[in-house]
Every structure is written in structure tokens, then in C-alpha cells.
Design a protein with these regions (language model features):
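Positively charged n-region of N-terminal signal peptides that target proteins for export
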Residues: 1-4
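Bacterial N-terminal signal peptides
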Residues: 7-16
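Extracytoplasmic copper-binding redox domains, predominantly the cupredoxin/blue-copper superfamily
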Residues: 21-244
Length: 244
């Protein structure tokens, strides 16, 4: 009996550790912040007079193209943060991701979604919008939405960081979708902070993308039951790659 127990314990001790498989030490968490150390540039003012309905919806408001949104201490919002690599055991997505067309702007401006997941565009304005996905990865679409309340759904086909969304009717309207084939992503909030949970233990490559400043990459070690902290720092000199 004792010999059998000893043999079982020895077998368990010598078994290889495989990240992401059921029965490992448990998942971990990555939390962190995206910062801009340079003074933020001024965002251009949007002139909506070309569409009377857009102009009426924003009357008396100063509407800007919020490409760079920072907190008082440099926290950078709207950065898409994600793990690189393949995670075949990750749970499949449930439900759709929604982007609203409200007051002639896309809201939110940056979202994340998974391959195979549906992204929905809702027209909340009493005017014609056109949802145009500019893709290099078979995620292309171009659909008119002339009626308030109309919803268009598209099932994302392939990974793409990032899928650029425009409106051919209102050229100032823009949004971005980070499409990955796993659930390990987040978008930085108003203070530049983000959290990604339920991550398989191990060493991972993590990336942050921002529409003005491009992509930063680093490695992070995640231990089961623990939280790893990372920080992405943009100096303001970075430039993104070509965008359609």
C-alpha cells in the first residue's frame, strides 16, 4: 500500500507542466497601465455641418476626433492590449460585440472581439450611415444603414489587429476592432488601466496597440493564482504602421 502511494506521488512529481491545460496550478491575471510620457497632441475639431441631422444632434457641443485621450497623469485610453500566440483550449466566445453609431460617432471607438464572434453595428441616429470595414484579412464589409434602429451584424473570419471601421457618408467617423482567436485581451480605460484574467500560466508575449502610436511588445510571466503587472510607455515619438 505504502509502495503504491509512493509510486503515485513520484509519478505526479515527474509529470511535465503544460500551460493552459486543465488540471494545472490554475490561471493567472495580468493587470497594468498604458501611459504617454509626452504632452498629448490636440485632437482636431469635427465639423458636422455637412449633415444637418449630425449638426443638430451636436449643437452647442465641441466635438473632437478623440484619437488621443489621456488622464491628468498620462494614462492613455483606447489602447488594445492582447496576448500573442495560439490558445486552442480557450473557451469560445458568447454573444456579440456592439458598436453604436450615436450623434454621428462610433461608440466605443476601440473594441476587441474574437474570430467567429459577431460584431454588431447599431444606427441610433435619424440619418444614413455606412459601415465600411477596411480589412487585409477577409473581414471586409460595406453596408448602408439608412434607418434609425437598424442593426448590421458581421461574423469575423480571421485575426486582425486592427480592423479599421469607417463611414463613407461621414468621413470623420472611425473605429477599430482588435480581432484575435482567444479571450485574452482588453482595451485600456480612461486612466490607461487594463486587466486580463483567466490566463494560462507561463511566459507570454503581450502587445499594446494604439491608433496614433502603434504597437509595443514585451514578455510577461504569469503564475497560477497570481497577478502579473505590466506597463506600456509611449514616448510620443512612435508612429503606427500603414493604415487603410
Amino acid at each position: 500500500m505504502r509502495r503504491g502511494l509512493l509510486s503515485l506521488l513520484l509519478t505526479c512529481a515527474l509529470s511535465p507542466f503544460v500551460a493552459g491545460q486543465p488540471g494545472t496550478a490554475g490561471s493567472g491575471v495580468i493587470t497594468g497601465r498604458v501611459r504617454l510620457t509626452a504632452p498629448p497632441p490636440g485632437n482636431p475639431i469635427i465639423r458636422m455641418g455637412m449633415d444637418p441631422r449630425c449638426a443638430e444632434a451636436t449643437r452647442g457641443k465641441r466635438v473632437v476626433q478623440d484619437a488621443v485621450v489621456t488622464s491628468a497623469d498620462g494614462g492613455l485610453a483606447n489602447a488594445f492590449v492582447h496576448l500573442a500566440g495560439s490558445f486552442p483550449d480557450a473557451p469560445r466566445p458568447a454573444g456579440a460585440v456592439t458598436i453604436d453609431q450615436h450623434n454621428c460617432l462610433y461608440r466605443p471607438r476601440v473594441v476587441g472581439a474574437r474570430v467567429g464572434q459577431t460584431i454588431e453595428f447599431r444606427n441610433s441616429d435619424p440619418t444614413l450611415h455606412n459601415v465600411h470595414g477596411l480589412s487585409d484579412a477577409s473581414n471586409e464589409f460595406n453596408v448602408g444603414q439608412p434607418v434609425k434602429g437598424q442593426v448590421f451584424g458581421f461574423q469575423l473570419k480571421r485575426e486582425e489587429v486592427m480592423l479599421h471601421i469607417t463611414c463613407d457618408v461621414h468621413r470623420w467617423m472611425t473605429a477599430y476592432v482588435g480581432v484575435v482567436d482567444h479571450p485574452y485581451f482588453a482595451v485600456s480605460g480612461e486612466q490607461g488601466t487594463f486587466t486580463i484574467d483567466a490566463i494560462p500560466p507561463g511566459r507570454h508575449t503581450i502587445r499594446a496597440w494604439h491608433e496614433r502610436y502603434g504597437t509595443l511588445t514585451q514578455s510577461v510571466d504569469v503564475a497560477g493564482g497570481n497577478t502579473a503587472v505590466v506597463e506600456f510607455i509611449y514616448t510620443g515619438s512612435e508612429r503606427p504602421g500603414p493604415q487603410r
